[in-house]
A protein has these predicted regions:
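Alpha-helical transmembrane segments of multi-pass membrane proteins predominantly involved
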Residues: 1-200
Length: 200
């Protein structure tokens, strides 16, 4: 991300080094990831301060914390409707950059999400509507990602929407709050890493 900021500060004529579309995609990615990081950080701070589940009257705060974490991770993982950065990034960036972001950073984010739900299980357990909404969001991501992939003419954008579809399937497994769902989600996440490395 620091490299993106360094490119912004390059002298006149730097446009010959980096294309305008590539720079725009990089800046979009940088800004959205900073916003995602702030949402997740705020969610973790509130979860650590208020310890949801320890006091009986704090369920609304647990819902707010879950909403913050969900929005942050949805932005980070390019779930619908926070997906706009991924097709642009895959289309405009170098293949190895796309592979690094999708295979390493997004998969690591999924593992952090699993650890977050393990550390604060009350966010899901004492909030019966939360997992249902997460599963609905994951299904919407799968549906829209798959349909959008069918409509693309650019192969790289098609791949990006298929990755969004796949991430929705992984997120559904995580939101199912079951050993089978979690195992399937982690297996599919590792499958996505192998697929991305082979494709790029």
């Amino acid at each position: 991300k620091a490299a993106v900021l360094a490119m912004v500060d390059l002298p006149t004529g730097a446009g010959m080094l980096v294309g305008t579309r590539t720079l725009a995609s990089a800046l979009k990615y940088l800004i959205l990831m900073v916003i995602a990081g702030m949402l997740m950080y705020l969610g973790y701070v509130l979860a650590d301060i208020y310890r949801p589940g320890e006091l009986p009257g704090r369920i609304p705060l647990a819902r707010f914390i879950l909403a913050l974490l969900t929005a942050g991770f949805a932005l980070r993982l390019a779930l619908i409707p926070f997906h706009a950065w991924l097709p642009d990034l895959v289309e405009d960036a170098a293949p190895m950059v796309s592979a690094l972001i999708i295979a390493i950073i997004n998969t690591t984010s999924l593992l952090v999400l699993v650890l977050s739900f393990q550390r604060f299980p009350v966010l899901l357990v004492e909030n019966p509507l939360g997992p249902t909404l997460l599963r609905i969001g994951a299904l919407v991501t799968c549906l829209i990602g798959g349909l959008a992939a069918l409509q693309q003419e650019n192969m790289r954008r098609t791949l990006a929407y298929l990755l969004i579809y796949n991430t929705g399937m992984v997120f559904y497994g995580l939101a199912s709050i079951s050993v089978t769902g979690l195992t399937g989600a982690l297996f599919e996440a590792m499958n996505q890493v192998v697929l991305v490395v082979l494709l790029f």
